[in-house]
Amino acid sequence: MAEQESLEFGKADFVLMDTVSMPEFMANLRLRFEKGRIYTFIGEVVVSVNPYKVLNIYGRDTIEQYKGRELYERPPHLFAIADAAYKAMKRRSKDTCIMISGESGAGKTEASKYIMQYIAAITNPSQRAEIERVKNMLLKSNCVLEAFGNAKTNRNDNSSRFGKYMDINFDFKGDPIGGHINNYLLEKSRVIVQQPGERSFHSFYQLLQGGSEQMLHSLHLQKSLSSYNYIRVGAQLKSSINDAAEFKVVADAMKVIGFKPEEIQTVYKILAAILHLGNLKFIVDGDTPLIENGKVVSVIAELLSTKADMVEKALLYRTVATGRDIIDKQHTEQEASYGRDAFAKAIYERLFCWIVTRINDIIEVKNYDTTVHGKNTVIGVLDIYGFEIFDNNSFEQFCINYCNEKLQQLFIQLVLKQEQEEYQREGIPWKHIDYFNNQIIVDLVEQQHKGIIAILDDACMNVGKVTDGMFLEALNSKLGKHGHFSSRKTCASDKILEFDRDFRIRHYAGDVVYSVIGFIDKNKDTLFQDFKRLMYNSSNPVLKNMWPEGKLSITEVTKRPLTAATLFKNSMIALVDNLASKEPYYVRCIKPNDKKSPQIFDDERCRHQVEYLGLLENVRVRRAGFAFRQTYEKFLHRYKMISEFTWPNHDLPSDKEAVKKLIERCGFQDDVAYGKTKIFIRTPRTLFTLEELRAQMLVRVVLFLQKVWRGTLARMRYKRTKAALTIIRYYRRYKVKSYIHEVARRFHGVKNMRDYGKHVKWPTPPKVLRRFEEALQSIFNRWRASQLIKTIPASDLPQVRAKVAAMEMLKGQRADLGLQRAWEGNYLASKPDTPQTSGTFVPVANELKRKDKYMNVLFSCHVRKVNRFSKVEDRAIFVTDRHLYKMDPTKQYKVMKTIPLYNLTGLSVSNGKDQLVVFHTKDNKDLIVCLFSKQPTHESRIGELVGVLVNHFKSEKRHLQVNVTNPVQCSLHGKKCTVSVETRLNQPQPDFTKNRSGFILSVPGN
């Protein structure tokens, strides 16, 4: 929901003023400043007044209020313009730039930092580590560049003494992926001299105030600022910047960015070397130049990783090549001092440029492929020195003010001139608004052959000794009649200007008097080749790489380098061309007073800035103009989905007609104008409503696309799955066939083998056939068994079946099953086993057959049995297919007990070689016996007994439980007891004895 400020704070947008006049503009600006509202809109331009105090309007909560909101929805703020530039870049894939302008001390540097902070905060919602790393480095680069490129001036405690333009690269999702920094015209003369009330660059003070005692000792420094000539002027000045704290912040930032420890140490050594250079004093002994404090030379040589004698020679002599001859020309005291200062300035400039290059190497976009990652878009942020008028204005102020003229010209071209020309070109009704075009001042400075820079270059190239006065004379002769140039010679009555020293330029921001003293020297930017060779020969690789031209031979003839002014002019032209290629957003900074006071609003001072920034003309153009314009084709491409007449494609005669239909459908026809090739929208609210409608339709479009795409994916997945299943099915069929064929091949002819294929190894089956293999092996084993059984006589088959049953039940659990001998079964009828009583047993057996009608005798044998009264007796058991009989052989095999087989629930035997067996019955009257044979003795018959009984029960489809355990559990008339087996050496025959838990069967040992 849109939030508007109360009228007590004035008009939030100058476009909403009742009348467009300077008094009303200034009254609104003053009211908002006094109410703590430092930002005001002019349409899509933000006017910012430096509050000279800390305001709590840049926190995370404020960022969230502006994130993704339109300009008119929230009160004026830097975040609003930053978000507008970001949205334009992301929505339309168009490069944008934010140009921050205003004079020195108006708050440009702080504004750029807040804009960077906002962009960093609203990007990378998914918290990708690489994006966070890039954002962190982009933010940290600010404080590093401020330390080495900013200084305290009379107008600003943190004045940028260089120009900075940063491109931030974004991927297709709108997340920062890298950047690039361009720097312009570092004010290196500040290294050696400062005006009263000013300081050198922050880096020197931070090192001395924040460096540890150990570090300063290693650099041969002391904390006293007044000990060093180059910074003595500002040593006692108070600054709002805490140098000691900032030193740690900058050091940490350099580590975060990626500077190596040895690189950071080299930076400190260079700063220390410059401070020591400033303390060098030269004297002349006759014709020989000398250094008064020679120990300092050794310190400088140590810091620069070179030799002291080489440093001394470079400071006192100049090597000159004349043809093939090379001579060392002695310096005068003045020339030596000049060379020392030029060397100090050059070292610092190279250091600063190296820092910028090093940051660029680290933050540049790497491995970005537009075909894979989408278009790489850019937001540029320009923070460059503001317009300056000092008591003494020299070459640096001339370049700085020329830069501001170029930027003002760009503003005029884009906002005032081109916009009005576009309305006329497109046939939009328009009343021309007058404005001051400063192109005449730009031409005065940069015009080929006729401009001040061209005249300065000509003077520098003249043979012989050329003075600054000669340069001024050339200006007078060539520009004397120019309306924006004057000097004492062209305007003799103007006593402000001194003869042979001053000239005045009528800039768009006001008149500035420049002193020509130093123009020639600063433009030539002379540094003797000896110093370049000295630094190139340093053993420190970082220093060596800063001076690549030092490798040139002394006799090598080089092309005359471009002058400082021409280099700066070329860089400004390139900068303006770069900015002109992007969609611009403006922050116009105003300085409320020269006393840095948060309470004072200097009307005259502010009025002057409003006038030269062209803000009133900007208001007039904005009130009469349109907030947005776009070609019909692009407009239709973005918004066609919000009307059924244009979605998905229109059938109207032209895109213009289609756009008209779309606008009428939405009811915005009163807020637009139709040009020849573009549509013009007057208010941002209409554009915002179009965006809302588009966003609503995009949901439906996305759902439709998702439905179609998901359907396509599902069909593709189904086809792939079906194809995969077909492949799997055929592959499995192939594997099955291969397996079957291999089995058939291996087992071919096994019927004719002696072992019927027992030795044949089965092939490894596929997983799907493992159960089939088990079944197949079972079938094969059954077949093989049937083949083996065919060789057995029919009379032996019952015995074989019984042995198989015994094996199934007892194999692996008992040592001897008696499988190797023939099983007779009815041992009581066998004469070898019972020679005296066999004749008596047979009639008894026949009588029982007649009586009980049994069909087969399963087993009979002599046993020793124990009863519940612990009485041990010799008995015999006779097992038929119907009953189990317990007999007394001493009484002619009288039947002592008959147990029907259906009453038998199981057998229990031990796991040893003994013949213990317990017959379990349903009535819990178990029969405990130990089998024994008389001929041969100790013959094992347990396996035979178990086998015939289990086989018989199986034939009747009943199950007989067989337990193999020691001790054996049993029940005598319902009483639980155990029978354990012990082996005794002197035991003649098996015998039972009583113990606490039941019985012990003692069997003879070996």
From Swiss-Prot:
Disruption phenotype: Mutants display no defects in body left-right asymmetry, no obvious motor defects, and normal kidney and liver morphology. Tracheal epithelial cells display aberrant ciliary bending angles and disordered ciliary bending patterns. Likewise, planar cell polarity is disrupted in ependymal epithelial cells.
GO cellular component: actin cytoskeleton; apical dendrite; axolemma; axon; basolateral plasma membrane; brush border; cell cortex; cytoplasm
Residues with N-acetylalanine modification: 2
Residue numbers binding ATP: 102-109
Modified residues (Phosphoserine): 200
Alphabetical list of Gene3D superfamilies matching this protein: 1.10.10.820, 1.20.5.4820, 1.20.58.530, Kinesin motor domain (3.40.850.10), Myosin VI head, motor domain, U50 subdomain (1.20.120.720)
UniProt domain IQ: residue ranges: 699-719, 721-741
GO molecular function: actin filament binding; ATP binding; calcium-dependent protein binding; calmodulin binding; microfilament motor activity; protein domain specific binding
Function description: Unconventional myosin that functions as actin-based motor protein with ATPase activity. Plays a role in endosomal protein trafficking, and especially in the transfer of cargo proteins from early to recycling endosomes. Required for normal planar cell polarity in ciliated tracheal cells, for normal rotational polarity of cilia, and for coordinated, unidirectional ciliary movement in the trachea. Required for normal, polarized cilia organization in brain ependymal epithelial cells.
Family: Belongs to the TRAFAC class myosin-kinesin ATPase superfamily. Myosin family.
Protein name: Unconventional myosin-Id
Organism: Rattus norvegicus
Lineage: Eukaryota, Metazoa, Chordata, Craniata, Vertebrata
Name of the gene encoding the protein in the UniProt record: Myo1d
